[in-house]
Amino acid sequence: GQNKEGLYVEMEIQIKDNKIYAPLKDKWLVLKPEEKVRQTYIKRLVDSYGYTISQMDQEIQVSNSQRGQGAARADIVIWRSKEDKEANKCPLIVVECKAESVTIHKEDYYQGMNYASWAHADFFVTTNLKETRIFKVVKGQIPDKLDEIVDIPDSKQADNQKEVDKLLKQ
C-alpha cells in the first residue's frame, strides 16, 4: 500500500500475544494456522497485486442458506473497486484459505467453488501458501465448472473488463 507521502510501504503482518491483526476486520484475532495463511495472502494481494484494504473483505457470508450447516463464509473476497464493494456489487475474486499443514483436495475446490458461484465471482483462488491454485468460474453450466488458469488480475486489470476477459480466456 502507499503511505501518506505516496511512497510504497509493504504491509506488515502484526502478531502479538498469540493474536494476529486482521486489517480487513480492524481487529486482533486468535492466531490460528488458517488465520495466519489468510493474513499472509491478504498481504500478498496488497503488496504484489496492488489491491487496497477498502476493496476487500474477510469471512463474508456468501450463501443465503439458513440450513443447519450454517451460512457459507468466504475467507477473502475482492471487488473490482472500493465503489463496487460499497454498492454491494458482485465481487471479482473469492479466496479460500487452508492451514499450511493441510493438503488441498479436490473436494476443497468444490466447496470454495460453490462460494465463488454463490458470490457470482469470476475467479476463485485456493491457497495454503505452499500451494496456490487459481481457477476461473465457468458460468452458465450446472454446476459451474473449474478451469485452472495462471493468475488472477492485479488491481489495475481488475477494473478493466477487457483485461479481465483476456485473463478468463487463458
Description of each model-found segment:
Residues G6-F123, K130-Q170:
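A short, conserved, highly charged catalytic patch centered on acidic carboxylates
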